[in-house]
Amino acid sequence: MSTSSDVIRMDHLLRLYGPEADGSRDLLRQYAHSMLSDVFPSDGSQRNVENEATLDLLAKVEQWAALMVPANATQRWLQPHILDVSDRIVQEHFTLVKERLDAIPAAL
């Protein structure tokens, strides 16, 4: 899957989780917007997949997913799926960072 489809899936799962997840959904939207701006800068500058602010948003989403306490059977079912998608988003983000770093020529 791609990051964009995982973000959409994560938002869907968080919406199903209930209003307790609204704050995390807001953070996820902020992350998606920030990541889009980092990868496709509107001013034509070089992409910046190492943006600390974007990484912080992603960390907050992941932290919420790890700390949530399900209150019912539906939330208990959703939690591992949310954690799985969250982990994929983190892995995909750091794959982009690694690709960026691998593209930097080594000093001679």
Regions found by a protein language model. Give the residues of each.
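Alpha-helical transmembrane signal-anchor/signal-peptide segments
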Residues: 1-9
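Alpha-helical transmembrane segments and their immediate juxtamembrane boundary regions
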Residues: 1, 97-108
